[in-house]
Amino acid sequence: MSKPISMDTTKSMTPVHVISPANIEWQTDDAGNKVPVSGEFGDVYFSQADDLAESRHVFLVHNQLPTRLANLIPKQCFTICELGFGTGLNLLATWQLWRQLRLTHPHLANARLHFITTEKHPVPFSDLAKILAPWAQRAPELAPLIEQLLASYPPLIAGCHRLNFIEDNLTLDIWLGDASDSLASLDGVVTTQRPYINAWFLNGFAHSCNETLWTERIFSQIQRLSRADTTAATYSCAGIVKRGLQSQGFVIKKSKGFGPKPEMLTAVMSEMSSLDEPISALSNKAPLSNYPNNTVVIGAGVAGLLTAWTLANRGISVTVLDKDAPLAGASGNPRALLAPNMTPIHHVYEHLHSIGYLYSGRLYRYFNQQAAIQKSPLILEQTGTLDLLVKTNIGTEQIADYPDTMATTISTEKAHDISGLKDKDLAHNLYLPQSGLVNPQALKTLILLHPNITYQQLNITNIEETQDNVILTGFESNENNESASRNSVAITTDHVVICAAYESHQLDQRIVKCRTIRGQLSWFTPTAEQMSRLPKLPLKYSGYCAPFIGQSSDAQLNHISENQPQFLLGASFVDGDANIDIRSEENQQNYDKLIEDMPELSSVLPNDISTWHSRAGIRTQTIDYHPLVGLLAQSQRLWTLSAMGAKGYALAPICAEALADMMLGCFTPLSAVTLARLSPNRARLHKVQKSHKRSL
């Protein structure tokens, strides 16, 4: 069997924050095969011969997945939840079945499979690759799936790691941490319908090997997340398992086990008295009456573009509206630095920046694959980043708790070598190997090529929500944001998502008025001599700087020549200022910050900064620094995703996933606590806004 999980019921409800990876021991079984054994629980992960067949027998056949998945209707999402990801073999078996069914059932082209799994002791990448390598040979149909899984396997930090396998319409959410905490975090925001689990894979060892697995808290969470047609399957027929399921409303049944095993257990949550009734009698079709056919996104910055792409990827027709051209605002900088704001490891479970950064990196690497096919510029240049503020933000001793693939400290010698700096003291540093530079223009171009997305330049002046739809009115505008015609344009749509940064409040006053923070970037074209002495990779200090090469599409947004080296530095920070005029004094501030932190560059940077190029944009931020993501109060069709601050390219992808899930009635990749922090209706924001109005 695949893997045990454990829960410590004596501890508090606080989630486990520091992940202890599985201790894999390789032992020889009775047949002379080398098999992986759990060092924590002293039992084998799987047998070399029959475990794939056993997985299919227990979890696929006895949850009746071949029939249930084949009977899905277009746009329907089927959700599986597994306790104990282990080596991923149950996922791979399910994925292969899903792929096979989609080939033979064309109506599944727009259906989705959502596989949620928990793991307290995840298998390290090197061990997982070694464990799965024989299965790629033994079961060739799994080989391409194993390759994709390993390519996306996340760093082992607590929280939810969303992996989207887009060509297969498969979403995998790996929740790392104690299973009971992870299940408690699965709290879908009730909008049009409450999400629920269709089938459970109760995957664990016998009660004698893992006594803390089958607890009342686990069974109560299973009940909370299920509904009348939910099924479950497990290897275990222990009395505690049967009693636990029965106490939560499941009807249980013993079935023939796999191979020599005499029996296994199946269950269904239903008023029916037995499992003998065929699955066709169970309600397998979630209500789709509220599933939107079309949605309008207002705002063509990074928040709007990622929201549009995420919804379009779910089969929804999306129209993106903006009074200006796409990326005309703060999202249109020459490059965006994708690097996390680090936090001590015990905070990471609820840390949006960490999970958002990792998901963004996976998504942008997928976009890179698409860009390569189209022979267009890459979206993410994975350069790595050296953070020189580590002592201020987190402390080098706390970096040791993170996987090296996410964040690490490097020797002073290596730091000097990769940065190109010679004189600065780099003894305290934070190296972020997966970080890099996002090309906003390339990202915009790729997203707007999606067949389900259209863009229209339109200045929206009114939004009216009715019971059946939303009606928007506005005026077409030209490139200078001037009304091209006084004839009103009306658009009717199922839903609207407002992603208009600080102007979102003007479109709907239920969205709080946010802080406006002006930021100006500077860049110049260095000579070959200067380039050889400038930093070789992005650096974070009291500002940030980065070298890059101009791409073919850059000139559409900024004064950048193709194939020419550029050096970017910034950015100014002017609170309460929404003016985007270029200011020479802010170029000077950017210069001064860099020289103050790295004096050796004073002889490298040009003395005359009047020739530098600049761009000013307005960051939008709430008073508690959390974005606004969700359905507006007293509304069924109006949403917002805004107030990303300076981290739009790291936060927008994961927030767009959460918003799409809320809109469609699915489980989000964010915990219930995090969703509450992001709600546009959270009490603290509106209390402060009302207090401010009274003081005026």
Swiss-Prot record:
The reaction(s) this protein catalyses: 5-aminomethyl-2-thiouridine(34) in tRNA + S-adenosyl-L-methionine = 5-methylaminomethyl-2-thiouridine(34) in tRNA + S-adenosyl-L-homocysteine + H(+)
UniProtKB keywords: Cytoplasm, FAD, Flavoprotein, Methyltransferase, Multifunctional enzyme, Oxidoreductase, S-adenosyl-L-methionine, Transferase, tRNA processing
InterPro entries the UniProt entry points to: FAD-dep_OxRdtase, FAD/NAD-bd_sf, MnmC-like_methylTransf, SAM-dependent_MTases_sf, tRNA_MAMT_biosynth_bifunc_MnmC, tRNA_MNMC2
Gene Ontology biological process terms, A to Z: methylation; tRNA wobble base modification
Flavoprotein found in the keyword field: yes
SUPFAM superfamilies the record matches: Nucleotide-binding domain
Keyword Secreted part of the UniProt annotation: no
The protein, known as: tRNA 5-methylaminomethyl-2-thiouridine biosynthesis bifunctional protein MnmC
Gene: mnmC
